[in-house]
Structures are given as structure tokens and as C-alpha cells.
Amino acid sequence: MLNDILSKLPPQAANPALLIGHETGDDAAVFKINDEQAVVATTDFFMPIVDDPYDYGRIAATNALSDVYAVGGTPILALAIAAMPMNQMSPDTIQKILSGGAQVCANAGVPVAGGHTIDAVEPIYGLAVVGLVHPDRIKRNCEAQEGDDLILGKALGVGILGAAMNKDELDPEGYRQMVETATKLNAVGAELSKLPGVHALTDVTGFGLIGHLLEICHGSNLAGAVNWNDLPILPAARDYAERG
């Protein structure tokens, strides 16, 4: 739907400095400043996916920072985006959400320099993030090459555990594994971008492994093959998957 909406917007003037726009569904926009630096810009936010407000803030912030890492960049600055039902949520709960996000940013060495808050019917939290990347190290999701191997920076299974949580079937250990993985920074992306054999990057989030792999394959005009037995899967997620 979003692609259809974007396609009907007024045409924008071509700018050779815009290295990544919205055309290929990459994780962030990239704008070239000079031969040594390009600015990475992204924003990401969502409604709560866990009940604990601190964990919610941590997960949302990690997800937003991930978009910069996913194009090979290093985040340098964040702005908080918060829409909260002020007449329904206590100041303490809101503070925990913001603190969770701020802690993740502190762990990443990224200052939260400000932001914007509004009153809303449903809580929404996330970040607008600015990063830097060398123009020669930008990695897109549409430049994979035939013969490339698929490398995952995290174990899979957060979606399965989230589904179990929504059914009130997730045990404490499963919750721990889910949150620990969802709050692990994808900083490895910035390091992988420096390797000559790495041609494409993305972060595996809402669309799952298959959804994001299809995005890479379609954008690169390739097909991909995945061996289920080779995939790193969280132990708790494997257990819940086997239960059906």
C-alpha cells in the first residue's frame, strides 16, 4: 500500500547527492555530503509489543538504530518520538519507556538530543536517527550478487515468541530470550559494510527472514535458497514452533 501511495506523490527533482531514497525500500535514506561522508537518516516507531514499558522503550530504540546499521552506517544522533495517552498513562510509565530508549542509545554511544511528544489515543514510541557512512561503504538491499552467502547477525525466533506472548503462552525464559535478542544492537552491519565481499545488507524485522530475503532477491534480480537446518534459532522459539 505504501509503495502505491508514494508512487502517486508529485515527482521530486533529481538530486545526484541522494544516494538512497525510497525507491528500493531500503532501511534508511542516504545523502552524500562529500567524497568522504554521507548522512544517513531514518525514523522508526511503533505501538507497544510487550507489557513492560522499559523493555518497550529498549526494543523500539534498538529497532530504530538498526536502520542506520542496515545500510552500513554508524548512528551519531537520535531524537525521540513519543505519542502518549496522557490521561491514561502515568508519568512513571512514560518515563520508563523513554528511559529504556535512552539506555539503548547510551549503550550505542548515541546521544538523544531532543525530540517531540504529543497526546494520543494509543502509545507510540521510537526515534529519528542520524548517522554517517563513507559513500563507498553504503550497502543497499538490492545489490546482492550471485553466489553470495546469507549471514545472520542474530538468532531468529522473536516473531514466534511474540506470537506466543500474545496468546499468553510465553514463559519467563522465552520472554527473556525474546527481549535479549530484540535489544541486541545490529552494530555488526557497520563492520560488515567494510568488507569487500559483502554486497547487500538489511535488518530482519517485521517481515521476517523470508520477507526480507525476498526483498533482497527481487531487488537484485536473483533467487535465494535457505537450508532450515543451518539457521540459528532461539531455543525457546524452536520449542514453541515444534508445539505448533
Segment roles from a protein language model:
Residues 1-244:
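Helix-biased detector of long, well-ordered alpha-helical tracts
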